[in-house]
Amino acid sequence: MIELIDVLASDGQPAGIRKPKDAVHRDGDWHRAAHIWIMAPDGRILLQRRSLRKENNPGLWDVSTAGHLSAGESAVEAAVRETFEEIGLAIPAGALEFVTTLRESSVLNGGRYIDNEFHEIFVVRREVDLDALRLDPEEVAEVKWVRDLRPDETFVPHAEEYALLSRLRRPGAQRRA
């Protein structure tokens, strides 16, 4: 089945167009994605290493879970869906703390994959038993908890998001709207 994505204007407003996901990335259309950061009560952060089968950034460490918003889907709906699909964790919508929206643009794979996204950033504060997770091998190679987030060349480049996350990782941290 072809996944359709709502195309946005560069200011984030709906363009009134739906396109297949591969066409969105081929053409460099702006679109939305949900990024879900899972944090343990003690401040540890859950990271995923992207599957080597992924078209973009294979094998790199990344956000706990993430994914495109399907056409007509809300960011909360996408966050709940993607977390379950990628790592088998059911997150109630009420557990998602919306933090902010970040705009990010990258060109990958020799210009064949243009990723112009508005990232809807969420935090979920809860303990997770890694052994109980069911990883989708098409999406996720492995997961791990880290106490100190130190992005380097083994991470998907999300500089602004990592900086924001380092401020939010403290228990009781205030979210930014």
Residue ranges: model-predicted function:
Residues Q13-K19, G43-R49, D131-L135:
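Short, well-ordered strand-loop elements centered on a beta-strand within folded domains, enriched
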Residues I5, G28, R44-I45, A132, ...:
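A residue-level structural signature of the nucleotidyltransferase/glycosyltransferase Rossmann-like core
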Residues H31, I91-G94, E117:
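Short gly/pro-enriched beta-turn/loop segments at secondary-structure junctions
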Residues A23-A34, A40-R81, E85-E86:
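Conserved Nudix-box catalytic region and its N-terminal flanking loop in Nudix hydrolases
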Residues E73-N109:
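Internal catalytic-core helix/loop-beta-alpha segment
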Residues W37-I38, G88-A90, R112-Y113:
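Short, conserved, surface-exposed binding loops centered on an aromatic residue
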Residues M1-H35, M39-P41:
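Acidic, metal-coordinating catalytic segment for phosphate/diphosphate chemistry
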Residues K19-D22, G59, A71, F98-A177:
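Nudix hydrolase/Nudix homology domain
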